[in-house]
Amino acid sequence: LAKLSIYGNDYDTHAGTVVRDYIHVVDLAKGHLNALDYVLSHQGVDAVNLVTGNGYSVLDVVAAFEKASGAKVPYQIAPRRAGDIAVCYADATKAKNLFGWSAQFGIEEMCRDSWNFIQKNPNGM
């Protein structure tokens, strides 16, 4: 098994790796359906974040995936990528206020469901 490359471990974050906002595909799909219902009954345009509003470090995701799969994820620390910022996540308040949507799944469920999909579909879709 190849090793996962984690780009940088010296960021000013709780785990030293970059922090990002990850979203479950089901939450994203439901968010798009809520947004579609909203635009069909309202005029104008608006930008809305479909996000969890929670930041997880790369090492948080690795740990959650290890828990979901029951296997260690081999990884190596690689040099930082040019331009990567330490923390990037967004606010989902507007989606909640405009069309009643908020993410329901956390990182543990995301990794569990990803692992289950991989197990059931070893060759992809």
Name each region found by the language model.
Residues 1-125:
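C-terminal substrate-binding subdomain of Rossmann-fold SDR/epimerase-dehydratase oxidoreductases
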